[in-house]
Amino acid sequence: MNVTLRPPLTTAPRRPDGAGSVQVQLDPNVVIGTAKVFSVYGKGGIGKSTTSSNLSVALSKLGKRVLQIGCDPKHDSTFTLTKRLVPTVIDILEQVNFHAEELRPEDFVYQGYNGVMCVEAGGPPAGTGCGGYVVGQTVKLLKEHHLLEDTDVVIFDVLGDVVCGGFAAPLQHADRALIVAANDFDSIFAMNRIVAAIQAKSRNYPVRLGGVIANRSAATDQIDKFNERAGLKTVAHFPDLDVIRKSRLKKCTLFEMEPSPDVERAQNEYLRLAASLLAGVEPMQAVPLKDRDIFDLLGFD
């Protein structure tokens, strides 16, 4: 039997996934300081940016200095606050070849409606790197320029229900994590995954669950059922009001809409939520359910 031996490979060894691109580099010594910090999570498309922006305005209406940080490559978190898609931190860093010392605050911080300060962290190109690096660099830049010293509240608006170490990076800085959810199975299933991620992060960081924001839902029976089993509580409820959808289309927050009963109703709920968060939200010791248990709990009989 003739045996042909394959010649040894002479090509360079395979590079690790994401090599040469932006990678997560979290510095445990970089902390935000005295500001109250909230991270907003939820299923993709559930209305986190709309919720975050209106909450930021509500907090500013109560006299607080607010900074909203968008943590999504779409960089549209602060769209209704600034009325445009502002450049991201990653875009600005690339322009100076990642020499952060060359940046000025006005290069990456933009003032939005009612004085809310806005930053879009952005993210690496699709399929490469880790968004956690950008979050870490954003917080580092803000601290280096002493911008966090003049801030009372920081809102992180985080990409979808991605709970990898990178996009869970805001949890390193947050006091409380808020989950936006609708009254449907997919949204609650995603919420359960987020609960698991927060539980994991809480072993090393002070972040705790602050509650559920029910959104785009006339009823909350399914959310209530999950909350009871998991140990959560709904802290605000925004029904599927058409004025909320229209505000996004008009590039504005609810606090800029023409007065109407529905607008006033939504505004008052945001102001109530903002006041309760400032007063202090007791941490919730939620326990995530197993996937099978969620199907049994919320599935068809």
UniProtKB/Swiss-Prot annotation:
Gene3D superfamilies in UniProt: P-loop containing nucleotide triphosphate hydrolases
Domain of life from the UniProt record: Bacteria
PROSITE patterns for the chain: NIFH_FRXC_1, NIFH_FRXC_2, NIFH_FRXC_3
Keyword hit for Magnesium: yes
Keyword annotations of the record: 4Fe-4S, ATP-binding, Bacteriochlorophyll biosynthesis, Chlorophyll biosynthesis, Iron, Iron-sulfur, Magnesium, Metal-binding, Nucleotide-binding, Oxidoreductase, Photosynthesis
UniProt-annotated stretches for the region Disordered: 1-21
Catalysed reaction equations from the record: chlorophyllide a + oxidized 2[4Fe-4S]-[ferredoxin] + 2 ADP + 2 phosphate = protochlorophyllide a + reduced 2[4Fe-4S]-[ferredoxin] + 2 ATP + 2 H2O
Residues the record lists as binding [4Fe-4S] cluster: C130, C164
UniProt feature, compositional bias: Low complexity: 1-13
GO BP terms: light-independent bacteriochlorophyll biosynthetic process; photosynthesis, dark reaction
Cofactor note: Binds 1 [4Fe-4S] cluster per dimer.
Signal peptide: none
Sample GO molecular function, one term: 4 iron, 4 sulfur cluster binding
Binding-site residues for ATP, renumbered to this chain: G45, I46, G47, K48, S49, T50, K74, N215, R216, P239, D240, L241
Binding site for Mg(2+): S49
Record keyword Cell cycle present: no
Transmembrane segments: none
Cross-referenced InterPro entries: NifH/chlL_CS, NifH/frxC, P-loop_NTPase, Protochlorophyllide_ATP-bd
Cofactor(s) of this protein: [4Fe-4S] cluster
Family: Belongs to the NifH/BchL/ChlL family.
HAMAP family from the UniProt entry: ChlL_BchL
Subunit comment: Homodimer. Protochlorophyllide reductase is composed of three subunits; BchL, BchN and BchB.
Protein name, UniProt field: Light-independent protochlorophyllide reductase iron-sulfur ATP-binding protein
Organism of derivation: Bradyrhizobium sp. (strain BTAi1 / ATCC BAA-1182)
